[in-house]
């Protein structure tokens, strides 16, 4: 008579291809559902337990499995989020879209005593449910279960390091090292909490910037991006440069961020100073930009291009070639071997733009 273990392994070999289809399908579904929710996660993995791994699990002293269906982690999917609060948002999607086996699902965070060493994650045992098994080829998947793990990226880092070190229980750790493990666990949990808080604060600040019309605020990525996207003056100047050059005008996050250091280099640290400088030099900035872009092989320019030429123009306006050269070298503008000539050309073009009749 075959043992339970042998029967399960035999059933596994017959159904392993179905479990592979199941894990891949759940992974693809989650990817689409998470994207539809407007969430961005670090990664989604799927796997099927290997035969050797299954055999070891079945032969553990406390194993009590009698059939393949008793094992709920043959197919597995892992979702790793950037933020711990997104773990709960992914969990909401899973509860809404899949049939959850609550008896076998685990919230590991709820199992932790305050003084117990360990870390958090959610484990849901699910089946596809009727909404995701409408097609005939999916019917054979309906009775199968899979385990979905959800962790933040820091929770995942802890779990991986913990596994690599080989200590999953605080009692297995040498007593003189337990405090160090506990401190590390607490630090990671605190870091998760702080990253969540930072994201919330950045969102709130972004809303404050959007509402702060006419209020002077410091220059940073959020405030400058808002000006580039929504500021009337910058939009007018950028559009004029686009119209005169015929180049496509696009917004790219990296370009907006690169302007911050350039503005700080020329002494602009507040939006009020930027606004005043642009307004005072609006005509010369557009003429300078249009002249400088003549003959270039660019197919497009970036929103905020007027600010880029404002920074260069401020230095050209001073006539200080050494300072302009330092600026070009700092931001790696122009060919290194020709930067002196490039700097002189910038000054000449700016002076010419400042005298439209010259």
Description of each model-found segment:
Residues 67, 134-136, 247, 251:
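Short acidic, glycine/proline-enriched loop segments that cap or flank alpha-helices
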Residues 81-197:
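Long beta-strand-rich cores associated with HINT superfamily self-processing modules
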């Amino acid at each position: 008579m075959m043992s339970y273990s042998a029967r399960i392994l035999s059933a596994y070999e017959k159904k392993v291809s179905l479990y592979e289809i199941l894990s891949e399908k759940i992974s693809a579904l989650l990817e689409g559902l998470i994207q539809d929710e407007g969430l961005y996660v670090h990664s989604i993995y799927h796997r099927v337990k290997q035969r050797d791994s299954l055999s070891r699990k079945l032969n553990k002293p406390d194993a009590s499995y009698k059939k393949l269906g008793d094992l709920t982690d043959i197919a597995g999917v892992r979702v790793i989020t950037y933020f711990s609060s997104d773990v709960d948002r992914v969990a909401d999607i899973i509860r809404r879209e899949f049939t959850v086996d609550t008896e076998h699902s685990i919230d590991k965070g709820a199992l932790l005593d305050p003084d117990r060493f360990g870390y958090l994650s959610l484990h849901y045992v699910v089946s596809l449910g009727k909404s995701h098994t409408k097609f005939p080829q999916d019917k054979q998947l309906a009775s199968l279960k899979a385990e979905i793990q959800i962790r933040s990226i820091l929770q995942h880092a802890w779990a991986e390091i913990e596994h690599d070190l080989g200590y999953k229980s605080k009692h297995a750790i040498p007593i003189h090292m337990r405090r160090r493990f506990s401190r590390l666990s607490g630090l990671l949990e605190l870091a998760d909490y702080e990253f969540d808080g930072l994201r919330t604060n950045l969102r709130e600040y972004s809303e404050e910037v959007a509402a702060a019309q006419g209020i002077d605020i410091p220059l940073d990525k959020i405030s400058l991006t808002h000006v580039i996207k929504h500021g009337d003056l910058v939009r007018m100047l950028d559009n004029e440069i686009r119209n005169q050059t015929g180049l496509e005008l696009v917004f790219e996050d990296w370009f907006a961020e690169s302007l911050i250091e350039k503005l700080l280099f020329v002494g602009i640290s507040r939006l009020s100073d930027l606004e005043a400088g642009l307004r005072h030099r609006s005509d010369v900035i557009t003429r300078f930009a249009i002249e400088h872009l003549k003959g270039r092989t660019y197919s497009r320019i970036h929103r905020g291009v007027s600010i880029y030429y404002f920074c260069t123009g401020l230095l050209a306006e001073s006539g200080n070639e050494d300072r302009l050269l330092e600026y070009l070298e700092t931001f790696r503008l122009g060919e290194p071997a020709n930067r002196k000539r490039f700097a002189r050309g910038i000054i000449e073009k700016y002076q010419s733009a400042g005298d439209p009749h010259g």
